[in-house]
Regions:
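Structured-RNA-binding interfaces characteristic of tRNA pseudouridine synthases
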Residues: 1-276
Length: 276
């Protein structure tokens, strides 16, 4: 059995997220169909993370097990011939059996794009959040720096991450079983501290202006559900003056989702890279 590492880029606008879902178009489900068409195997690819509906990826990492002898270079070409243009396989390589796209990751980087111009082109609109209204960007820069380091990010998680993870894992196994898919997604008996709590380490959190775009870059050892978009939503409230820079520290300490701002739209978010 071969364990392959794929690097994917995709336009999340066309999909209901990464994870396979009944009667909805997903990135994972589309990849399942492409692999079955190519190899005749029913296998469930595992991503480094489950991007939500509308979230894009420049370099999502995927592991997939297969008995197919197709060389990796040929596999890339063949999959790209089958997949829709909104998904591209950028690279593929053989990995040892223990390598797993999610569990082996040590860091991820996301970027969030806000378009600040008065008029947003329709060709750009699906890849940014258009916000032409006044913002104090200097305060947003200050606020972003406060989340660097190790913190409990419960206030910025959509739901209890542990409960959600268990539910998603159960759903994944159920769907895989119903579809007769082979998967290497079984969790190890001993879960790491990172998987058991809401504490994450953020190595970089910064806003930068590039012409008419305000771009937030965040790199960390892991992210909770909606964490990046909830951070962005809160930083936007700081920029608008509804929250102060000091409020961000207070929100972190409260460990209460209701203390933070609304979730920013999915369109501006990109998974940029995954490190191993």
């Amino acid at each position: 059995m071969r364990n392959l590492k794929l690097t994917l880029a995709y336009d999340g606008h066309d999909f209901a997220g990464w994870q396979v879902q009944p009667d909805r178009l997903s990135v994972q489900g589309t990849l399942v169909s492409a692999f079955e068409h190519l190899t005749g195997e029913k296998t469930l690819p595992q991503g480094s993370g489950r991007t939500d509906a509308g979230v894009h990826a420049l370099a999502q990492i995927v592991t997939v097990t297969t008995n197919s002898p197709i060389p990796v270079d040929n596999l890339i070409r063949a999959l790209n011939d089958i997949l829709p243009r909104s998904i591209r396989v950028l690279a593929a390589e053989e990995m040892p059996p223990e390598f797993h796209a999610r569990r082996s990751a040590v860091a991820k980087t996301y970027r969030y794009h806000i378009y600040r111009g008065a008029i947003c082109s329709p060709f750009q609109a699906r890849y940014v959040y258009h916000h032409p209204y006044p913002l104090d960007e200097s305060r947003m820069i200050e606020a972003a720096a406060l989340v660097e380091g190790e913190h409990d990010f419960t206030s910025f998680a959509a739901v209890d991450p542990e409960k959600r993870k268990e539910t998603l894992a159960a759903d994944q196994e159920t769907l895989a079983a119903k579809a007769g898919l082979q998967t290497n997604s079984a969790e190890p008996a001993h879960k790491s501290g990172l998987e058991r709590n809401n504490v994450r380490t953020i190595f970089l959190s910064q806003w930068q202006r590039h012409d008419d775009e305000l771009i937030y870059t965040v790199r960390g050892n892991g992210f909770l559900h909606h964490m990046v978009r909830n951070l962005v939503g809160t930083f936007l409230m700081v920029g608008k003056g509804s929250l102060t820079v000091a409020d961000v520290r207070r929100i972190l300490e409260l460990r209460d989702r209701s203390a933070a701002a609304a979730t920013a739209p999915a369109s501006g978010l990109f998974l940029v890279s995954v490190e191993y």
